Amino acid sequence: MKIRHWSALSLFVLPALAQAEALTGEVHRQPLNIQAIVMFLLFVGGTLYITYWASKRTRSRQDYYTAGGRITGFQNGLAIAGDYMSAASFLGISALVYASGYDGLIYSIGFLIGWPIILFLIAERLRNLGRYTFADVASYRLQQRPIRTLSACGSLVVVALYLIAQMVGAGKLIQLLFGLNYHVAVVLVGILMVLYVLFGGMLATTWVQIIKAVMLLSGATFMAIMVMKSVNFNFNTLFSEAVKVHPKGLSIMSPGGLVSDPISALSLGLALMFGTAGLPHILMRFFTVSDAKEARKSVFYATGFIGYFYILTFIIGFGAILLVGPNQTFKDAAGALLGGNNMAAVHLANAVGGSFFLGFISAVAFATILAVVAGLTLAGASAVSHDLYASVIKKGKANERDELRVSKITVIILGIVAIGLGILFEKQNIAFMVGLAFSIAASCNFPIIIISMYWDKLTTRGAMIGGWLGLSTAVILMILGPTIWVTILGHEKPIYPYEYPALFSMIAAFVGTWFFSITDNSETGKQERLLFKSQFVRSQTGLGASKGGAH
């Protein structure tokens, strides 16, 4: 019972973990939705045209990785929101509210808490110190090759795990929403993702994410307005009517129904909070703006859009309780919701807007997946081409043309691997992969970034040992935990009793980095400490920072 309760929590706290709920159990295939197919084709046609347009404007390495630094703060804020808001969080959080009520609000807002960290501690310094990837920042005053190797490995592991989650989620959700075959859906997403990134680079990826964010926010806003209209825009009426029709009655207005293990809750909370600040595809977006001021604006707008979206999902969830729950049209013979609870928001779209709006929401779900996987692919490709190839293998002497070629080859390889893994993991519950992705981002990427920016005594030795310690501890504890050790490998009891490792792996990373830095008395270590002052000046003033193009 304890594990079951915690599993419910773990599936919904993160946007991508919310997706995992759609991946477990039987998928109820929906009939082919012609409106959804037409709107989806319009979206794909429009975004492929944008990719063609972007390809004409993507001539240099800077254009490919950062759209030439010409994206405005507002545009980048929308794109970050588009990169971060998942279709399944839309379906998953609203499904949680539909099933459990108030708990959904706690988790959807809890998922926002990583953004103030990025706004106040990271965005400005990241933009001033870096150029294309966060490894530029981590290696600013440390030894380039070992630090970039560690950063690239951390990035690629996070990208790979997140990509598997998105691809499997894409296949299952498209099967749910469109009635398409799972394998066809995965291959389709893989091909489109490669086309966007291969030809359009960051410029095409940015505009796909902006369009998706606008579509998702517009659709969710319309649904929320229609729900409120049905109760004369009175929240008291919405909640009191929902309590009357929900099987759990008044308990849907109380918190805490899903939390039974405080250590796991704390561990997942840390992964969520600090992992957000270590996601490579999110951090990469801060280099697309012209300066630190625009980077701060980006986070400000993104936080507003994401927060607004999660408030809408709460209204949508209660709207589904009121308008979908009592309606037998949306139930099967046994009285369960057609397609499972994850379809609550989709059925609500049908209830408030008919088949046309249902088609729109289904197309938005597909658009959302494409936007997220495009951002992940570009982050993975830049880690290989810029960090590993140009800086480690070629020791900073690679020419721009070769680096771009390596990046584009990596995009194709990532696309093939993503399709293969998506098909391979079709039957798996991949919630633990996303939890591991966030845990690794919090245990490896985040400590390196934050300590390199703020602590003057950091040395390469400390960063390397601490970073690898955090990365390996996160992976080992995840394997020894209940999800893999018991559920997948079939052992009777887990060696590590908690679902997520971040609480312990983050401590290992920070303590390891601190201890092995302060005990480093080498000449190299002393030189690295002396370089902190010049780094601090640049991080605060932007003097010497790479400049984006004019807007």
From Swiss-Prot:
Please name the InterPro entries in this protein's record.
Cation/Ac_symporter_ActP, Na/Glc_symporter_sf, Na/solute_symporter, Na/solute_symporter_CS, Sodium:Solute_Symporter
Q: Name one GO biological process term.
A: sodium ion transport
Name the Pfam families on file.
SSF
**What keywords does the record list, in alphabetical order?**
Cell inner membrane, Cell membrane, Ion transport, Membrane, Sodium, Sodium transport, Symport, Transmembrane, Transmembrane helix, Transport
| Entry annotated with the keyword Transmembrane | yes
User: Is the Transmembrane helix keyword given for this protein?
Assistant: yes
Major location category of this protein: membrane
Q: Where in the cell is it found?
A: Cell inner membrane
PROSITE patterns linked: NA_SOLUT_SYMP_1, NA_SOLUT_SYMP_3
Instruction: Give the record's GO CC terms.
Output: plasma membrane
Q: How does it sit in the membrane?
A: Multi-pass membrane protein
| Gene3D superfamilies registered for this protein in UniProt | Sodium/glucose cotransporter
Lineage, top-rank taxon, reads Bacteria
> Which GO molecular-function terms appear in the entry?
acetate transmembrane transporter activity; glycolate transmembrane transporter activity; symporter activity
- Provide the transmembrane region boundaries: 5-25, 34-54, 77-97, 104-124, 150-170, 184-204, 207-227, 263-283, 304-324, 356-376, 406-426, 430-450, 469-489, 498-518
What does the record give as the function of this protein?
A: Transports acetate.
PANTHER family annotated for this entry? CATION_ACETATE SYMPORTER ACTP, SODIUM/PROLINE SYMPORTER-RELATED
The record's family statement is: Belongs to the sodium:solute symporter (SSF) (TC 2.A.21) family.
Protein name per Swiss-Prot or TrEMBL? Cation/acetate symporter ActP
Give the source species: Yersinia pseudotuberculosis serotype O:3 (strain YPIII)
